[in-house]
Structures are given as structure tokens and as C-alpha cells.
Amino acid sequence: MIDIIKVSNNSELREFVMFPFKLYKGSKYWVPPIIEQEMNSFNKDLNPNLKNADVELYVASKNDEIVGRIAVIVNWYEVKEQKTSKIRFGWFDFIDDFEVSKVLLDKVVESGNKNKLKYMEGPMGFSNLDKVGVLTSGFEIIGTMITAYNHSYYVNHYEKYGLTSEKNFHEKTFMFKDIDTAYYEKMSKIVKTRNKLNEVNFTSTREVMKRTNEMFDLFNRSYAKLSSFVKIIRSKKNLWKKNT
């Protein structure tokens, strides 16, 4: 029998955060997250995304042992302002037992129905600044910063539940010694000249902070057309600057 437990205190949150350390113990390719940062991701005082989002965390337990976890997320800015009727899920890890993954995904469906949302998408976080995606190949390659590493059996669980791939992303690794930089240096000069661009060199954090609003605005314009993009709003900008 699988028991589903809703995380309700710091002790349970730590168990939620630490589960992958057991699941991927001994893996040469999984890169462990910084525990404090993971804990802070679910702290409303430290994560500005939680000002506009609701999250419910669940762990699955079998024989008094944690065997899976999931975060169920509603980003209300995305739902109300961007008119995207979607519930998100992330931090989704589980042993190779479909009963476990199914009961966790059922919590996403349950919350989506409760909030009258039309579809679910994941794994992803609160925004595009969190880890995203399911690894479908390259399991023998060390994980990257933006994509989550997972066991090969994950794909079968998603497909068995009835989920389909919405986007496919390809990551490539290039050795510096194999790259001829002459072409890129030439194109860089052309782009700078044509658009009258200059590098800005900063010598202190204070100088950087003066231009952070411009950087956030550029980020919003640059990635607006990306799938599942959520705009960085003013309150998030201010809180991030305050915590920097």
C-alpha cells in the first residue's frame, strides 16, 4: 500500500528535499543540488515566485519508507494574466514502481480539477529559472544545470500514465580545443558595429545592481516566446534585488 503525505513542516520538507540523494546514491551522473537552496525554494520569504503561486508538496511512502515525491504548482500570474489554464508539477522523483508515480501524478490531476484548470505540464518549476524536462537519452552523461537528471525508467512511467512530449530539446557538448573561434569573433565584431554596441564592464556589485531592472526587462523580452515562459514582474525583481 502506498501512503501519500502532504508536507506540512520543515522536518518533512527536508525529507522531501533529501529523497533524491537516496534515489541516486552511487550515480556518477546525477549532480546533487545545494540543500539550502532547495529548502529556500519553498520559503515564501526567500522565493519571490511564491508571492504569485501556490505549491503543495507530497511524498509517497511504502512500508514507512519514502519512495517518491512531487511538487504541485499553480502559478497564478500565468493562469490569470497570461490566460494559460495550466497546473504545473515538478521535483518529481520516484522508484521504479508505477503505483508510486501514478498516485503522485493523481495529486496533480486532483488539484488541477479543484482549481478548474484544463491541463497539466511538467516536470518544471515555478518559472523558466527552475529545472525543467525529462531526460530521454544520454543517461551516461553528467547532468546539466538547467535540466534535471533522471533514471531511464522515468520515460516509461510518463507514457504509461498517458502523458505525451510537448517539446523536445537537444543539448550538445563541445570541447574548446575543437572549436575554431575566428568565425565567431568576426561575426561578433560585425554585430557590434552594425548595432552600435559596446560591452559594459562592472567593477562592483553596486554597479551591477543599478542596471538590474534593465537586465530583467531584457530577459522578459528575449524569452517571451519560449514555451511555458512566465514574465518576471516588479515584485519579483525587487525581492531578488533585496536578497542579493
Tell where the protein language model's regions lie, with residue ranges:
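Conserved beta-strand in the GNAT
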Residues: 59, 65-75
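Acyltransferase donor/substrate-recognition loop-hinge adjacent to the catalytic core
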Residues: 2, 148-229
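A short helix-loop-beta-strand connector motif used in the catalytic cores of GNAT acetyltransferases and
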Residues: 43-59, 242-244
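Short amphipathic alpha-helix that is part of the acyltransferase structural core
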Residues: 1-45, 195-239
